[in-house]
Structures are given as C-alpha cells and as structure tokens.
Swiss-Prot record:
Function: Probably plays a role in cartilage scaffolding. May act by antagonizing TGF-beta1 (TGFB1) and IGF1 functions. Has the ability to suppress IGF1-induced proliferation and sulfated proteoglycan synthesis, and inhibits ligand-induced IGF1R autophosphorylation. May inhibit TGFB1-mediated induction of cartilage matrix genes via its interaction with TGFB1. Overexpression may lead to impair chondrocyte growth and matrix repair and indirectly promote inorganic pyrophosphate (PPi) supersaturation in aging and osteoarthritis cartilage.
Disulfide-bond pairs as recorded: 161-195, 165-200, 177-185, 330-376
Signal sequence coordinates: 1-21
Organism (species): Mus musculus
Gene that this sequence comes from: Cilp
Name of the protein: Cartilage intermediate layer protein 1
Domain spans labelled TSP type-1: 150-201
Entry-linked Gene3D superfamilies: Immunoglobulins, Thrombospondin type-1 (TSP1) repeat
Main location (coarse class): secreted
Subcellular location field: Secreted, Extracellular space, Extracellular matrix
Tissue: Expressed in articular and meniscal cartilage (at protein level). Primarily localizes to the superficial and intermediate zones of articular cartilage (at protein level).
C-alpha cells in the first residue's frame, strides 16, 4: 500500500511539474492586451445623466469605413475590450470622430444596444461612404467594474483533456493582463490541472441510413451504387484521379479509369457523406453525396488547375510607441485556398500555436525588442508563398518619432544668382526624409492604419537670397515632426506598340485579372489609376483585331504615388497554318534566319478535341508565335517578369530559352480547340551553358498572377535528322488547354543586384536625382569563345527609381566574370536617358565606379565602337563581388543577400549613372517641391501646387519674331489673395524653339502659376504673371480673345512696359483660341507633359513634338539681335562652372548645355527618335 501511495505521489509531482513547466513556457509567449486608457469623468457622463440612470462606457472605435462600411459591433468590442462593456447594455450612443451625432449626418445607419452599431456604404447616396463612427453604451448601475479590477481578464474555459480515452492528462486555462504597468502582471497567465479523460466506449456512431462499418467511422448502404465522371479544365477526361472518403481519416476508395469515370458501391446517399477527389497539379474536388431514395446516383465534376498561393495583401510598414498595439495582415489566394499562415520576426518563426496560423498578427503591449522585420508565409496543399518583408518600428514613450533636424537638400538657383558663400548656383533649403513614424492612433487594431503618419516639415523660415540686382525669397525647412502623410495616387501610363515596326495596338483592351480596367487609344496609349490595395500590377493586353499575341506584363509602379510611363512591346501574331487533326504535325520553333530551330512541337494524330471533350477530326487553323531569345530586339516583348515560386515560398528567377504562344481553332467555325499529348523537342545544342541542360523545365504562365508554373521536366532522347547527323534532344510532354503561353526555362540561383541612379544633368548631384525612372536590364548569354559578344538574351527586368536610386536584379557569377553580361537602359515618360560615355573619354569619376573594379566589369556605352549609335544604354560583365575584396564591397554590384546594403547605399558609394539631356528650361519654387515625389508636398500659401491630389498645369504660347532664339521668363506672384499678394510663387524660364520653315520665327511654351484656390480652399487667388523675354524685345500683339477675356474679368493688370506682358491669370481653362493651355491630372509631370504637347501643337486636344509657331499663340514679341559680347541667360549659365558645395560626392565633368530642340529643328526629344544598336548584334533595333 505504501508503495502505491509513493507511486501516486511521484506521478502527481511529475504531472504538476509538467504543468508548471508548460505554464512558464506559455506565460513567456502570451502577449498582453493593450490597456484601455481612462476617460476623464467629465466625458464619461452623458449630457442627460439625470434622465438616464446608469453609467456610460468609454468610447469605442474598432473599425473604419473602408471596404463595405463601418462596423462597431458589440461582439467585436467585447473581443478586444472584454469586461469594459456590461452584459446587457441599456442604450447606445454613436457619433462621428468629428463629434457629430449619428442622427445628424443624414446617413443610413443601424444600431441596437444588444448588437451594436453599423453603417453600410452601399446604402448611402451615390459617391458617398459612411463616416468614421465611435460608440459608447449605457450600462445598468454597478454593472461596470472599477479600474482596480481591470488588471486581469477573466479565466478562459478549461481546455479539453490532453489524454486519450481512459487515461490521465492535463487541461489548461488562460487569462490576460490588462495593466499598463508590467510590475502588476507578476501572477500566472496560464494554469493547469490534472484530468481524467472519458472512459473508452463501444462505437457510438449512429447511422440514419445504412449500417456502421467495421471501423466505426462511416455509414454503408450495401445496395447503393455511385457513378462519377471527372473531367479536366479543357473538357477532356481526368484519368487516374483518386477518390477518397472523408471519415475520421481519409480512405481511398478507387481511381478514375482512362475515360475519367469511376464506380463506388456501398456509400449512403444521406446528403452528408463527403468525397474528396484528387489529381496531381489540380485543386482537390470536394463532393457531398446527393440525398436520394434511388439505388444509384451519378455525379459530374471538373478539376480546376491547382494554383500556388499568391499574396494579395502584404503586411504594411508601421511605427508604434512602446505599450501600444499593432496588427500586421497578410492575405493570399490560391486553389485550394491557403489554410495556414506562419509569421516570422527577424527570420525567426513565431510560435504557431500562439497565433493559430491566422493571417492577422496582433501584437499587444509592444516592447522595443519586438521591433524589426516581419513577414508571413501562406501555405496550402498546392505550395507556399512568402510575403514581402515589412518593418515595424517601436520607440520609447519619451522618444521623438522623427529626427527634428532636416537633412541637406540643394535647389538650383537662377542663372544670375551665383552664391559666393557656397561658390555655386545652389542653395540648401533642407528637407525631412519621408518615412513612417509613430503618430497619434485610435484604439482600433486594423490592417491599415486609419491615419498614416510620416515625418514632414513642421516649421519653415523665410529667407532672402541675394541675386544680381534683385532678392529671391525662399522657405527653408528648420524642423521636422510626425504628421499626417500627404495623400497620393499611383498611376501607370504607357504606349502599346509592335516589336517589329512600332505599329500601335489601337483600341485594345487592358485587363487586370478578369476585369477590363482600361483601353488603348488610337496611338496605343493608355492610362490606369491603380487601386490602393494593389500589391503587384499584372496587366494583360488583348488585341481585338488579333494582330498581336495577347501579352501579360508585370509593371512596376510607385506605391508612394506619382505616374510611371511604360513602353509595352507586343509580338505580331504568326499567320495561321492548316493542320490535319488525324495526322502527326511538326511545328518548328525558331525565328533567326540561317539558324536551326530552338525546338519543335510534335502534335500526334487524334490529339485535338473540343472544349466539351469531344474529339476533333477536321482541319485545324494553327498559329504558333515564338519569341526567340537569339534575337535581342525581342527582349522587351518578354511576357511577365520571368519569376516562379519554389516549394519554400520564395520567388526565384528564370532564364528563358524561348517562349511560344499557341492558338488552335476549327478552320470552319473558328471554335477554340485543345490539344493533348503534345511533345516539345528542345535541341540541346542550343543550350550553350552545359549546367542548364539537366535543369531545363517546361513552364506555363498564370495570367492572373504573372508567375510561371511548372508543366513538366525534360528527358534526353537521341534522334537522327538525316543519314549522317544524329542529335540529342530534350523531350517534354504537355497539354494545351486553358493556358496558351509556354516557356522553355531554367531556374537560376546565381543572382546579384546592380545599383543605378538617375540624374537631371551631368553634374550628378545627389539632390538632382530623379524618381519614377524605369530602369531596365537585359541579361545576356555569352557567345562561345567570345565573352564580349552576346549570344542571346535570357531575361528582362524593370525597376522604378526611388529617392535612393534603384537596385536591378541580374544573373552573375563569382568564378567566371564573363559568364553573364547585361545591357542597362533607362527612360522617363518615354524619353530615354543617356548613360555616361566610355569612349573617347573613359572617366571612372563620371561613370561612378572606381578602378580597378570598373575594368573588371568592362563598362561600355552602346556607342563605344560606333558614334552613330544612340547613347542610351551600357553593357557590363556581371562579375560577382568577392567577399574579401575591399574595392568590390562598396558597389555597384551587390550579392543577392545584400539587397538591404544596395538599397541603403549612400550617394558616395559606387553606382552606375544615367542623366537627362539638359533642356532649355528652368523652374524655381519659393516653397521647394520635388515633382517626382508627391509626398514632399508642404502646406503653404506660396506652394506652386496648392492641392496634392490635383495638379493643374498652365502654359502660355509666346511667339518671337527675330533672328535668334530668346529665353523667356514668367514671374509669378500673388495677385488677389490677402495672404500672398505681392509675394513670389516662383519663376519659370524657357528658351524659344525655332520654327522649321520660318528662319526668323521661334516660339516658346511658357509655364505659369494657375489661378485658383490655395491650399486652405478658402478663397481664390488670381496669379499676377509677368512674361518677360530676355533680350531687346518689345510687345507686338496680344491675342484678341485673351485680351477681351481679361478686360471682362476684372481686375485688369497694368501694361505700361512694352518689353514685357503682365496679366492676372485667368481662372477658366481657356484653350488654344486664347493661347492658354491647361491640364489637370493627379500627377504633376503628366499634367505638364500633356499641356506642353498641346501647346506645341497649338490645339486643345492634340499633341505634337514639333513646335507649330503660327497657331494657338497668345503673345507676340519682336526681338532684335543682341549686341556683340552680351550673353543670354543660358549662355551665362554654360560659361560658369557648376560647382557643388556637397562633399564626399564623386563629381563628373561639367558639360556644355545641349540645346536639343534648337539643334533638332524644334523637336521635343523622345525615346523613339533614333535606333539603339548593340555592339556585336546584327538584329533589328531594340527600340522602334
């Protein structure tokens, strides 16, 4: 007996020790709920407290009116705040966050004390959404606990016993500490106790129909027969599919035969039994047994292609103070849908049992050690995918969220404003780096913060800059703080043209998924406003006339706002050929004349079938278009971004050996046909890198995600072409059903990043970097024996430049520097930027890369050997930096794992450069604003653009009669607003463009500050505009319609000086009949580009790159030739060296100003004016 007691005691000690050990472990991982801050008693009492006995809760706001509406439901409030709400509230009160009662808003709302409050966007007036509401509840007296009782939540129910039936186990319960002070939370958050599970019993399964089977997990009906027919997405049969019965454990019942049919006896048609049907590469089918009294039943089902999970919502960057709460959200789709989410903090997996595999990660009572990088991994039976990495910043209670000291930011001054103090034409006005900061947040825990806070300028000082003969006012940033981010909108514009001759795709459709979102115009142009929640922009361009192959593109865009321009190149669809469905057909895949095909398609006889699965025996009209990577001019037509997702959820690149698009149709009815058992024969001699041969795979494109998915492997097979020649082919099998674009690709893991920056001029100043430039890289394969001459291209990528340049992914090799080489190009709004020259001058300081690493990279601009070739690209060898080499550790090539170092590299680090050809114009704003970055907008009465989401550009056309081109200036000042009258908004300079046909006539399209509301939207200001030609000029005439308008819209500006023209700018968008051109857009560059094109054309709806001097003119000046020795504004600027006060920056040579428009006969420079030819490649031009 004593021995038994000793054993029982030891067992209890062991079990209690286990419980305490689990308690300690779990207590360390439990997150505390954010404490609810006390509400002052004056706010806690309602106005009608004498008429409403009871006590009011605090105000709750757990939702915002995004999505379907605003939901302040009682059950959700209880979930977050527990016992802060009583069990049975008596009343409910709702107000907007602006403190307006819900009944006074005029909106349709719903509410009850037992259910809470809600407002639906679809029930409101058109164009109006619900306001953001906050609610509180009136509770019976004494039903709300005091603050002292809010240290701990109530215990949760006991968990189930951990032991199997008939055994002893442990069950636990938990509670949460609600206190703001950690010292009050010293007690246990989890406790456990021993438990005895239920005694094991006989089978307790009851069957409403049939009998229980021997395993006691299903009901069986011996006289019932289930028939099934399973088909593939294209209508064909699905042989070999497994049929499972879902019981306590899935049981395989049978497989489908060659015709996709199956029979299963003994199941019960009870309307409850569930079958699961699976087949490799397809999403499982779940079927509930039909309920019937018959002896048999037939089910039909069609597989849906399995799709790897795809991230549609990435966690957002957020900032919080210690003690606050935050939620990070991740969402993925797929077939089947992902059922598990894993969260990682600084690459360490967070405890899945704590966060329940949920897509929303909630962290309460944050501590500073929880700051860092977070990402999620979504998982399903079809695979896994990882989200983008986001940054969570956690600062101390007393820490400043932003650095109050602005960083240096140089602006360029006018030509007559040289500063002796800095010995340059630049002035430091300062700026605040725009980054997410920990600002004021409400109590709601949301995926997207209700208010996004950024560091921005909070205080400026007005300073005066001394220039030659006048003073120039400016506003300098002196303090930064955390404030609401400027509202922005992301826009993608572009032009869709053919790869071969530049023919536009007219009136084609643009799809995002299954939704048509835009349409191309007559010139192939399109504009798309990107939805706010878009993570990856995948667009499919469909030609209604079927001239071009449908093309899917993944287009980079700026999530922080502004417009990005893309040139979309499409392959012309091959002329169809006629095939006999009852014969074996061979179709070659190759487009290079004089070269063997890369591969062949072999379509055996009787392989074609209709969409319903019926075999097709007639004539087939077949169009197979092959994108041949041996022709470098086709690189820009590559579809998607050539990426796939591996089994671990990581995105990996592919190196292509050719893409082909297929279109099979019934010659008689044009009905689309499918083809099964198609073979692809890849000529192994076309694969120049031996290590790629065993890794070759066949892929198809998912048009919804823009990702490539594996179709199958290749195997070796020898074939004899003729009596003497025998070749080795890689043979792969495929079926052509719902997907029509295929790829011969190799996964490639040898990756690096190239650092590229783009500048406004050859001065290469950090403050003159351009954002929103599309930088593209073409990966090349070397020709055997000639490392400098490319054999074929293998991959095409594009990246958008940000405030710190861009990092382009490219293949690289650390053993052989010549294994890979690349071409790099850059364009802005369709205009190609120039690369730094490599011949006849080779200046490492100008290129941006020091020696000896630059020699190893073999930098060559495209005109290196032929000066007639365009200067808009450069080629380098992708030599991976050696880890122990100091000269290779600071860029411009970074190892793939060093992406963060590439993105955060300072301007002094090595990088490659592109620059704009300096045009003959100059802009100065009193309140500095970077047009590439709409988030740099500052609230100020003197802001040139008064509204951050509505940029209005105004131009006036000025005609100059005289032998020389003249610099024309607009000086823009406040005219009628009491806050700005007499104060300078800014100045604009532009040089007139000579007319092609009239030697003594030139014209200028001059920007001026539009009249209208200022930033406070209180009252309008008629801008006082002075148009001043810089020379010996006098006003000859004023457009009569413009003059009449100004006379009829007083006040009228005084014009006593005939050498200039003064007006109070019109409020109305007048048009070409007045010589005024006005365009409003959500992107400033787009507005200016469109308005400038109309001004050049002299119309209100057209566009031109050639100046038409005699149409749409507002002002005419007669200008005499300048005296000998007197310099123009731009000549003065050319003759003065541009020196920067910035230190630590690699400076290039200072070029002479290029007068592009004058030298090209009035042309506005665009990217398509001259062909770009690559060294050693005798193919068609890359840019058409």
């Amino acid at each position: 007996m004593a021995a038994i007691k000793t054993w029982v005691f030891s067992f209890l000690v062991l079990e209690v020790t286990t419980v305490l050990g689990r308690q300690t472990m779990l207590a360390q991982s439990v997150r505390r709920v954010q404490p609810v801050k006390r509400t002052p008693k004056t706010l806690a009492k309602p106005a009608d407290s004498q008429e409403s006995p009871g006590e009011w809760t605090t105000w709750f706001n757990i939702d915002h009116p995004g999505g379907q509406g605003d939901y302040e439901r009682l059950d959700a409030i209880r979930f977050y705040y527990g016992e802060r709400v009583c069990a049975r509230p008596l009343r409910l009160e709702a107000r907007t966050t602006d403190w307006m009662p819900a009944g006074s808003t005029g909106q349709v709302v719903h509410g009850s004390p037992r259910e809470g409050f809600w407002c639906l966007n679809r029930e409101q007036r058109p164009g109006q959404n619900c306001s953001n509401y906050t609610v509180r509840f009136l509770c019976p007296p004494g039903s709300l606990r005091g603050d002292a009782e809010h240290i701990w939540s109530s215990w949760s129910p006991w968990s189930k016993c951990s032991a199997a039936c008939g055994h002893t186990g442990v069950q636990t319960r938990t509670r949460t500490c609600l206190a703001q002070t950690v010292s009050l939370c010293s007690e246990a958050t989890e406790e456990g106790q021993l438990c005895m599970s239920q005694a094991c019993t006989a089978c307790d399964l009851t069957c409403p129909m049939g009998q229980v089977n021997a395993d006691c997990d299903a009901c069986m009906c011996q006289d019932f027969m289930l028939h099934g027919a399973i088909s593939l997405p294209g209508g064909g049969p699905a042989p070999g599919a497994a049929v499972y019965l879902l019981a306590k454990a899935p049981k395989m019942l049978t497989r489908t035969d060659s015709s996709g049919r199956f029979r299963v006896p003994g199941l019960c048609p009870d309307g409850k039994t569930i079958l699961k049907i699976t087949k490799t590469k397809f999403a499982p089918i779940m079927i509930t047994m039909p309920k019937t009294s018959l002896k048999s039943a037939t089910i039909n089902a069609e597989f849906v292609r399995a799709e790897t999970p795809y991230i549609v919502m990435n966690p957002e960057m957020k900032a919080r103070r210690a003690g606050q709460s935050v939620s990070l959200c991740c969402k993925a789709t797929g077939k089947p849908s992902p059922d598990k989410y894993f969260w990682y903090h600084n690459n360490t997996l967070l405890d899945p049992s704590l966060y329940k595999h949920e897509s929303k990660l909630v962290l309460r009572n944050l501590q500073q050690d929880q700051a860092g990088e977070y990402f999620c991994k979504a998982q399903s039976d079809a695979g896994a995918v990882k989200s983008k990495v986001t940054q969570l910043t956690v600062i101390a209670h007393d820490e400043t969220p932003c650095n109050p000291t602005p960083e240096s930011y140089l602006i360029r001054l006018p030509h007559d404003c040289f500063q002796n103090a800095s010995n340059s034409f630049y002035y430091d006005v300062g700026r605040c780096p725009i980054k997410t900061c920990a600002g004021q947040q409400d109590n709601g825990i949301r995926c997207r913060d209700a208010v996004e806070n950024c560091c921005g300028i909070s205080r400026t000082e007005e300073r005066e800059i001394q220039c030659s003969g006048y003073t120039l006012p400016t506003k300098v940033a002196v303090e930064c703080s955390c404030q609401r981010c400027a509202e922005t909108r992301s826009i993608v514009r572009g032009r869709v043209t053919a790869t071969d001759n530049g023919e536009p795709m007219r009136f084609g459709h643009v799809y995002m998924g299954n939704n048509r979102v835009s349409m191309t115009g007559y010139k192939g142009t399109f504009t798309l406003h990107i939805p706010q929640d878009t993570e990856r922009l995948v667009l499919t361009f469909v030609d209604r006339l079927q001239k071009f192959v449908n093309t899917t593109k993944v287009l980079p865009f700026n999530k922080k706002g502004s417009a990005v321009f893309h040139e979309i190149k499409m392959l012309r669809q091959k002329e169809p050929i006629t095939l006999e469905a009852m014969e074996t057909n061979i179709i070659p895949l190759g487009e290079v004349i004089g070269e063997d095909p890369v591969a062949e398609l072999e379509i055996p006889s009787k392989s074609f079938y209709r969409q319903n699965g019926e075999p097709f025996t007639g004539k087939v009209k077949a169009s197979v278009t092959f994108l041949d990577p041996r022709n470098i001019s086709t690189a820009t037509a590559a579809q998607s971004d050539l990426n796939f997702i591996n089994d671990e959820g990581d995105t990996f690149p592919l190196r292509t050996y050719g893409m082909f698009s297929v279109d099979f149709r019934d010659e008689a009815t044009s009905e689309s046909l499918n083809a099964g058992k198609v073979k692809v024969h890849l000529d192994s001699t076309q694969v120049k890198m031996p290590e790629h041969v065993p890794a070759m795979k066949l892929w198809s494109l998912n048009p919804d995600t823009g990702l490539w998915e594996e179709e199958g492997d290749f195997k070796f097979e020898s074939q004899r072409r003729n009596k003497r020649e025998e070749r080795t082919f890689l043979v792969g099998n495929m079926e052509i059903r719902e997907r029509r674009l295929f790829n011969l690709d190799v996964p490639e893991s040898r990756r690096c990043f190239i650092k590229v920056r783009t500048y406004r001029s050859e001065r290469f100043l950090p403050s003159e970097q351009i954002q929103g430039v599309v930088v593209s890289v073409i990966n090349l394969e070397p020709r055997t024996g000639f490392s400098s001459n490319p054999r074929a291209w293998g991959r095409f990528d594009s990246v958008i430049t940000g405030p710190n340049g861009a990092c382009l992914p490219a293949f690289c090799d650390d053993q052989s520097p010549d294994a890979y080489s690349v071409y790099v190009l850059a364009s802005l709004s369709g205009e190609e930027l120039e690369a730094v020259e490599s011949s006849p001058k080779f200046n490492p300081n100008a290129i941006g890369v020091p020696q000896p690493y630059l020699n190893k990279l073999k930098y060559r601009r495209t005109d290196h050997e032929d000066p007639r070739v365009k200067k808009t690209a450069f080629q380098i060898s992708m030599a991976k930096p050696r880890p122990n080499s100091a000269e290779e550790s600071n860029g411009p090539i970074y190892a793939f794992e060093n992406l963060r170092a590439c993105e955060e590299a300072p301007p002094s680090a090595a990088h490659f450069r592109f620059y704009q050809i300096e045009g003959d114009r100059y802009d100065y704003n009193t309140v500095p604003f970077n047009e590439d970055d709409p988030m740099s907008w500052t609230e100020d009465y003197l802001a040139w653009w008064p509204k951050p989401m509505e940029f209005r550009a105004c131009y006036i056309k000025v005609k100059i009669v005289g032998p020389l081109e003249v610099n024309v200036r607009s000086r823009n000042m406040g005219g009628t607003h009491r806050q700005t009258v007499g104060k300078l908004y800014g100045i604009r300079d532009v040089k007139s463009t000579r007319d092609r046909d009239q030697p003594n006539v030139s014209s200028a399209c001059l920007e001026f500050k539009c009249s209208g509301m200022l930033y406070d939207q209180d009252r309008v200001d008629r801008t006082l505009v002075k148009v001043i030609p810089q020379g010996s000029c006098h006003r000859a005439s004023v457009n009569s319609m413009l003059h009449e308008y100004l006379v009829n819209h007083l006040p009228l500006a005084v014009n006593n000086d005939t050498s200039e023209y003064t007006m109070l700018a019109p409020l109305d968008p007048l048009g070409h009949n007045y010589g005024i051109y006005t365009v409003t857009d959500q992107d400033p560059r787009t507005a200016k580009e469109i308005a400038l094109g109309r001004c050049f054309d002299g119309t209100s709806d057209g566009s031109s790159r050639i100046m038409k001097s005699n149409v749409g003119v507002a002002l005419t000046f007669n200008c005499a030739e300048r005296q000998v020795g007197r310099q123009s504004a731009f000549q003065y600027l050319q003759s003065t060296p541009a020196r920067s006060p910035a230190t630590g920056t690699v400076q290039g040579r200072v070029p002479a100003m290029r007068q592009q428009r004058a030298s090209r006969g009035g042309l506005r420079r665009r990217g398509s004016m001259a062909p770009l030819r690559f060294s050693g490649v005798a193919q068609q031009p890359l840019s058409n």
